[in-house]
Amino acid sequence: MLRVRCVRGGSRGAEAVHYIGSMLRKGFVGWVQRSFQSTQAAAVSEKPCAADEKVSDTAVQECPVCSYNEWDPLEEVIVGRPENANVPPFSVEVKANTYEKYWPFYQKHGGQSFPVEHVKKATEEIEEMCNVLRHEGVVVQRPEVIDWSVKYKTPDFESTGMYAAMPRDILLVVGNEIIEAPMAWRARFFEYRAYRPLIKDYFRRGAKWTTAPKPTMADELYDQDYPIRTVEDRHKLAAMGKFVTTEFEPCFDAADFMRAGRDIFAQRSQVTNYLGIEWMRRHLAPDYKVHIISFKDPNPMHIDATFNIIGPGLVLSNPDRPCHQIELFKKAGWTVVTPPIPLIPDNHPLWMSSKWLSMNVLMLDEKRVMVDANETSIQKMFEKLGISTIKVNIRHANSLGGGFHCWTCDIRRRGTLQSYFS
């Protein structure tokens, strides 16, 4: 059973780990006792930041990579690129993650560029976002520009690419380790290539680098007969625990994991299966504990527009997708904040996301948040919480599927690992 000892930030919310560790474990025990087969490719630097498991906080802080949560002071970040963004082919896994009104768009433009003028405006917005981050004292890194329209073929499928816009989807930083997620969309199979120059540099400078087992993405990974004719069908299926991805092999996107020190919260989604969560659980054990949480509407592609932990014991919980375990957080003393209804216009294209990108914010520290300049309601909410808002307009960038949290991957945050284990 978990016992709490907070190293920093007080004890607010820390007890939630005890509750979730004891309550959620009950529903997952049967699953984790099965014998899963997984592989991993982990690299160890010639001069690693951590020579053993008992490395000091000082040693870890000297690494180019160090981040334990979503709110410690941000020092370095990767920001994605919209350049050459390509519409993914309209395959079954894409259909399961997009809204019905956009299906004709994918059927018509799959394998082609997203609207050029829209991407141009998104590029300008993200450049401004980078400038603002630099002004706030954050080091900004960018992935490579790649031609995503090139068709590729594996023994199991063929596809074109998509983009390198959302580093949060593919990279998860846990302490001094960068984990490359395997992904679940065929159009994103080679997305890691855009980030390899950066990752290799971090590795040479001492960071740990792990690549999760790459799925074949064979037909068996997907329910080819997933019965979705409308969004309502999809919501009902997901609520029953039926997703387009099967348990044929591990798959997950990094954006389905939310970090809070030694405890990491994950959801089973259309792109993250239980095998993928189990791989992560085994890989991070015993130093970190992965907890599965679930929601009334489990269909959204990633967790960070549903459940966003923005401080120690402080969480944004989407009112349209309430967390089934939210009372456990409340009983533990967490402050649960319900964000206001988003203000994004109905006629603004959101090809692979919902309006709730308004809560997909990036914390620069516990008292500063990067938020969309158009979302005045949520700005007021943050101000009432005593959090200063840094306003940037990324409406066109939203159309490509992400808010500030999605468009970034924090590489370094100045802080220490909180201990939650006995």
Swiss-Prot record:
GO cellular component term, pick one: mitochondrial inner membrane
Pathway: Amine and polyamine biosynthesis; creatine biosynthesis; creatine from L-arginine and glycine: step 1/2
Catalysed reaction equations from the record: L-arginine + glycine = guanidinoacetate + L-ornithine
Chief location category: mitochondrion
Cell compartment(s), UniProt: Mitochondrion inner membrane
GO biological process, one term: creatine biosynthetic process
Keywords: Membrane, Mitochondrion, Mitochondrion inner membrane, Transferase, Transit peptide
Gene Ontology MF terms in the entry: glycine amidinotransferase activity
Transit peptide location on this chain: 1-37
Residues the record marks as active site: D253, H302, C406
Enzyme Commission identifier(s): 2.1.4.1
Subunit architecture: Homodimer.
Role noted for this protein: Catalyzes the biosynthesis of guanidinoacetate, the immediate precursor of creatine. Creatine plays a vital role in energy metabolism in muscle tissues. May play a role in embryonic and central nervous system development.
Family: Belongs to the amidinotransferase family.
Name of the protein in its database record: Glycine amidinotransferase, mitochondrial
Organism of origin: Xenopus tropicalis
